[in-house]
From Swiss-Prot:
Organism: Wolffia arrhiza (Rootless water-meal)
The keyword ATP-binding is assigned to this record: no
Family as reported in the entry's similarity comment: Belongs to the intron maturase 2 family. MatK subfamily.
Plastid recorded as keyword: yes
Gene: matK
GO molecular function: RNA binding
Function as written in the Swiss-Prot or TrEMBL entry: Usually encoded in the trnK tRNA gene intron. Probably assists in splicing its own and other chloroplast group II introns.
Protein name according to UniProt: Maturase K
Length: 508
């Protein structure tokens, strides 16, 4: 980042073509190479391909020149995406350049964000371009006190040029935007990527960084009205609501929010008259919960559609917005089946010498793991069958024992990490059991023995200590409780660090 900043400060910002020369810098592609190595996915590949060759400025120049020669090289042979020319796959050239291209696009936005933080200015709205979600914390505390929820699918742009216009507001660089148009024309069906899961999956796999950047730049515009409403109707007004949108500023937000007192509100009556609402998003799925009436939500629905179509030129349909009432409605979000559960309780009250038992009902936000999609994902990855019975993974038997255990352990920790927000842990225990027994069967198959014999030889404590590593770390964080491990399994713990697409969530 310091090299980028030094380059831009030497007059690069005053030039019209300040981004395009960065495409020929070798360290840009070295950075993309490191990101490719460090990225982890649910279906972890056995090897990392596509980045096995060194980059040079001469190679990049040749690749960009070949990309622009659409008529003679790319689109001349049957319009087949798997066509090979000059000994390479055409898609391979696009993947090489697009990864570095995405990093170059993020440079000016990252520098503006860093400068705004140092000067303590308001965070710009493009600060969450690297995140795939906008989640305001304490969701489990807000939802039980709200009455209605709107389930919304964000609209899609009517034309690819609309995405270029969005970026033109931030990046004044003609050659860079022309190169972006070239990528759009190659993936002519990218307009369906926002709503079509199949095409989105293919594009995101081939160009993950570019896909994330372009998609989130569009979503920032589409959700800007929701952020405005969230600011206007919130009860807790912290120093700045900008950091609430970005997962990297979560801990900074915790420092700003303190105990709210009545004297902190300048207009307490006006605040409490406003209908409180809560807003969360994952990819194109948006949830807006409100204390208002059903009629108010209907007005919001009409307002959103007109605003998107008339102001942003985003096409939206009434069927993409559904209004439901708590607590009758259960919804899928972030891989959880969430609902509001009414918990009965009794309160003992005393008036003079008389005692009374008052029955009351307390709403509680429940998050349950949707076990069926997870088992389906594990079955497709060959960890179990469709019934959830663990099986061995033959393709890993050629690896060393430590590598096999490390892969299973990493996957188990990732799932525990992701689904730690569940209020009921039984499904999470089942997932751990499937992975643990699948690991044992894989090792037993490698050594040509039975699972029982293998476990007796190594001891079951070895697996327990390995899979309990994360729980021990978290128990130290909760050491102030009398029984931290029990508290860990009983209460949900949320980790807001989702910065990429999650295959398990996409199956819902």
């Amino acid at each position: 980042m310091e090299e980028f900043k030094g380059y831009l400060q030497k007059g690069g910002l005053k030039q019209q073509h300040f981004l395009y020369p960065l495409l020929f810098k070798e360290y840009i592609y070295a950075l993309a190479y490191d990101q490719g190595l460090n990225a982890s996915t649910f279906n972890e590949p056995d090897d990392i391909s596509g980045y096995d060759k060194k980059y040079s400025s001469l190679l990049v120049k040749r690749l960009i020149k070949r990309l622009y020669q659409q008529n003679s090289l790319i689109r001349s042979v049957n319009k087949d995406k798997q066509t090979r020319f000059v000994g390479h796959n055409k898609n391979f050239y696009y993947q090489m350049v697009s990864e570095g291209f995405a990093i170059v696009l993020e440079i000016p936005l990252s520098l503006r964000l860093v400068s705004s933080l140092k000067e303590k200015k308001d965070i710009p709205k493009y600060q969450n371009l690297r995140s795939i979600h906008s989640i305001f914390s304490f969701l489990e505390d807000k939802f039980p006190h709200l009455h209605y929820i709107s389930d919304i699918l964000l609209p899609y742009p009517v034309h690819l040029e609309k995405l270029i216009q969005i970026l033109q507001c931030w990046i004044h660089d003609g050659p860079t935007l022309h190169l972006l148009r070239l990528f759009f024309h190659d993936y002519h069906n990218w307009s369906n990527c926002i709503t079509t899961k199949k095409s989105s999956y293919g594009f995101s796999k081939e160009n993950p960084s570019l896909y994330r950047f372009l998609y989130n730049s569009y979503v920032v515009e589409a959700e800007s009205i929701f952020v405005f409403l969230r600011k206007s109707s919130s009860y807790l007004r912290s120093t700045s609501f900008g950091p609430l949108l970005e997962r990297t500023h979560f801990y900074g937000k915790m420092k700003h929010i303190g105990v709210t007192r009545c004297n902190d509100f300048q207009k307490p009556l006006g605040l409490f008259k406003d209908p409180m609402m809560h807003y969360v998003r994952y990819q194109s799925k948006v949830l807006i919960a409100s204390r208002g009436t059903y009629l108010l939500l209907k007005k919001w629905k009409s307002y959103f559609m007109n605003l998107w179509q008339c102001h942003f030129d985003f096409w939206s349909e009434p069927s993409r917005i559904h209004i439901n009432q708590f607590p009758k409605f259960s919804f899928y979000f972030l891989g959880y089946l969430s609902s509001i559960e009414m918990t009965p309780s009794s309160i003992k009250s005393q008036m003079l010498e008389n005692y009374f038992l008052i029955d009351t009902v307390t709403p509680k936000f429940q998050t349950i793991i949707a076990i069926s999609p997870i088992i389906g994902s594990l079955a497709r990855a060959r960890f179990c069958n469709l019934s959830g019975n663990p099986i061995s993974k033959p393709v890993w038997t050629d690896l060393s024992d430590s590598e096999i255990i490390d892969r299973f352990g990493r996957l188990c920790r990732n799932l525990s990490h992701y689904y730690s927000g569940s209020s009921k842990k039984q499904s999470l225990y089942r997932i751990k059991y499937i992975l643990r027994l699948s690991c044992a069967r894989t090792l037993a198959r490698k050594h040509k023995t039975t699972v029982r014999t293998f476990l007796q030889k190594l001891g079951s404590e070895f697996f327990e200590e390995f899979f309990m590593e994360e729980e021990k770390v978290l128990s130290l964080m909760l050491s102030r409780t009398s029984n931290p491990l029990h508290q860990l399994y009983r209460e949900p713990i949320w980790f807001l660090d989702i910065i990429r697409l999650n295959d398990l969530v996409n199956h819902l």
